[in-house]
């Protein structure tokens, strides 16, 4: 208890490298990276890259554009970095030859009314960062008359959607947790102390993921909300213990020390059970479980440290009731 000021200063200083580490941690959007190496899908993807130099692919639906303009568009797409092949009618025959001369079975595969289909193959993996950059460049080249589809385009949209919505649902979770604690706790300031402490531990957890090199987008999307939900109970538990000890000790610092001693074993026991559940995910052959399990187990441990630390400052908040 007597070292609470140095502990607070240390925690605040750790937020700086944590923020840097969080920004530098790569987010992996490729689910193939988490599949076992002996799966046919992974073997096929590796063979496609090694033997044919093709990994990602995309289909572009071109609507209401003349054949000459489509041919010009294909040439511009070929200039995009990491585009390996662009397949369209002009890849098989000169565009001066009417497409209607093709057999119906072939013509109908690539044309429907005023729309035509262009296939694009890239020399990079389906969800690589350079692939997503290439998809964005292709979309900027194509304009509003074209619709880019395929797995790589889906992953690109998924990344943009996750980055856009994550702050929204994390903010909603914080507001709901804050509202619940304000209603059910006997001190209006305590919820903000708890949320600040847990927020710091979430940032520390996300920042230390830098040492893993990368985490999956699913882990990134879920870990903050899960850590908030799982570790908030520990703070509330300790707060109620502090209130009980406050009736027995006139000095708030003595009450804090007694509350920590009285509840620390229970909190650690509960957290170990939670950590064990997340560690169990590490034994999945689908290694996304390992990715999520390690991050969340680390988050729970940091959450326990944070909630015990945050109790050191509740006496000041209690005096402001």
Regions from the PLM with identified roles:
Residues 38, 42, 68-121, 156-160:
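Extracytoplasmic
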Residues 57-63, 116-120:
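Active-site-flanking beta-strand signature of metal-NTP-handling nucleotidyl enzymes
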Residues 62-64, 90-92, 150-152:
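A general secondary-structure junction signal
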